[in-house]
Amino acid sequence: MKTIKLAVIGAGARGFLSYMPYVQRFPREVEVVAVAEPNEERRMRFAEALNLTSEQLYSTWEEFLNEPKLCDALLICTQDQMHYEPTVAALRKGYHVLLEKPMSNNPNECVEMEAIAREEGRLLSICHVSRYTPFWQKMKQLISDGSIGEVMSIQHNENVGYLHYAHSFVRGNWRNDTLSSPMILAKSCHDMDLIRWIVDADCTKVSSFGSLSHFRIENAPAGSTDRCTDGCEVESTCPYSALRFYMQDIETNPFAALIADPPTEANRMNAILGGPYGKCVYRTDNNVVDHQTVNMEFENGVTVMFSMSGFTRDMNRIVQVMGTKGEIRGDLLSSTIDLFEFSTGMQTVTQIPISKSGHQGGDDGIMRQFVSDLRNERYIDTLTSAQASLESHLMAFAAEDSRLNGGAVVDMKLFRQSFAPASSPSSLTLDILH
């Protein structure tokens, strides 16, 4: 059995913490031979964990790609706006790519990357890890088996969780769409992908409403300050207090471990005192929506209502799939799927085992599938290939376009046509390839 050799571009939370445990557990399947990471602490931590030598370490992806081809594939886990250039350069150099979602925050770049992967005959797989979880696999199986007849409508709720929202989308890296992507893409492209996968048809119309309503300077309480540590008069009662949130035990609050490296108590306090995670949630440079709804119609007549909210107790996804012969209700947090059959009145509740791997088994699942696809030379139309993912990305871009235009209905056929590659993919080159 051939051992697949990988290089990792971006050794942060996803590149290191999410995907490397699989590599460490299955060294005969996959081996990491290099890492490119600008942060020295992260680079050295990665090297120690994966037993890499100094010759296998690179500060930038450009430095790595200037070398002769070293391995089979790259795992690219940079920030959203830094996906396009390394991906195109890697594909052009003959590498297969596993790319963290979203593909890009620019729809033209998404279209071009998919076209280049096809032209080069390379596998470009997108990290839509939810498709690989036992929960969503079971949901898809029940629908495909006809358990509820023909699907008519779907209600899909993404409950972001009030603390997760404040951490990632008010104070964190995804707070501003000029730094990352719109919320519907940065957070909800998983959901757009799942919806497209479950419906199994192209989307024809999209309409969306939403806004940044609460986390704004005009809603800052009287007596609040720029930072939670500046003598804020309401810090002790504020649900978003950085001191209360980030100084908790990191074993019970995983977000607290993300603001400092290593996440010692002293380092976390320094991060609160001087970094973005200590800012008042009403006084940051955030601009992404805190709630949004999307209505969709598909070619097969299915209608979908999607809701994303940052104002929920739990981080959860709740889905209701309504068919001609029954109904399915799924609760991701409890990992239960409730099937009701109209003809018999029978209700069947299935408890889905929860994997210890990240994203309820999805992180391991996508690594396993990517390695298998490479070993068996499956490069086109895989479960989360760029070909499969592009449609859901365009749905997200269309939803944002609608939201910014007062909920105007977007015709998806015309929308897709507007993002055809501006030039032939074969003419798209980067300096790194010259």
Walk through the language-model features, giving the residues of each:
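N-terminal Rossmann-like dinucleotide-binding module
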Residues: 1-52, 434
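Predominantly a Rossmann-like dinucleotide-binding segment in NAD(P)-dependent oxidoreductases
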Residues: 12-15, 130-279, 406
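Conserved acidic residues
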Residues: 33, 55, 72, 152
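C-terminal helical cap and adjacent loop that interface with cofactors, partners, or active-site loops
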Residues: 50, 288-434
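Conserved SAM-binding strand-loop segment of SAM-dependent methyltransferases
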Residues: 54-60
